[in-house]
Design a protein with these regions (language model features):
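P/S/T/G-enriched low-complexity
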Residues: 1-224
Length: 224
């Protein structure tokens, strides 16, 4: 994340019109969601947890301001679940009013979408839904998997693909219309179903690569 911030500042140094510079916001996600801006925690019983919250609102990232962005990233400490749905919901509110601005969301995660410790279909479904709303509004969503087993090369419709890899594909712009919805199978039960839709294509006609692992996250330098 810090190398990405450095790259944004480097590129902004070549943009003379401040109103047209790339702007950056930082959102963290862990436990309960709060609309307060900052880096706050809350207590449940004997444990403290991170809120899911906006840490820094949208602002130009320049050589003069990049340290403020990096310090926010460096201040994040693991404490709580991985409430991806709350993070992406908060990200929806962090978009520029400039109609000509390219909207990009970069979703870093080091684990499974959870409420506690296991994969949560409910959290994953909501997260995919929030991501789809942003994609429908014209945003490009990159997902970066910083966890063991992250494998963007795997076809999410293939056999033996983990829910985590399916989730990372579905959140990203690899699949613009992806959903993960609850469908009733009888009057008393149902299940969550992945529906990826068509794979987006790059300018070269090949499959789009909006889902990346830590090993190829450096490609983000070429996003803008």
């Amino acid at each position: 994340a810090n190398s990405f911030i450095d790259e944004i500042a480097k590129q902004n140094a070549t943009v003379k019109d401040a109103a047209k510079q790339h702007q950056v916001s930082i959102v963290k996600f862990a436990g309960n969601k709060t609309d307060k801006v900052g880096n706050d925690t809350y207590r449940e019983g004997q444990y403290w947890y991170n809120y899911s919250q906006v840490m820094k609102t949208l602002a130009p990232c320049t050589n003069d301001t990049k340290s403020a962005f990096s310090s926010q990233v460096n201040a994040i400490q693991p404490a709580g679940a991985t409430n991806a749905a709350a993070g992406l919901e908060l990200a929806k509110g962090q978009t520029s009013d400039r109609s000509d601005a390219k909207k990009v969301v970069i979703f870093f995660t080091d684990g499974t979408p959870t409420e506690y410790s296991e994969f949560s279909p409910d959290v994953a479904s909501s997260a995919v839904g929030h991501a789809k709303e942003m994609k429908d509004a014209g945003a490009a969503v990159y997902s970066i998997g910083i966890f063991q087993g992250a494998d963007p090369a795997k076809n999410p419709d293939g056999q033996g693909v983990s829910n985590e890899n399916k989730f990372m594909h579905a959140v990203s712009s690899n699949y613009p219309s992806a959903t993960y919805s609850y469908e009733s199978t009888s009057w008393w039960s149902g299940e969550y179903i992945w529906n990826f839709g068509d794979r987006a294509k790059g300018s070269d006609g090949k499959d789009a690569t909006f889902y990346k692992s830590a090993t190829n996250a450096d490609d983000l330098k070429h996003v803008f």
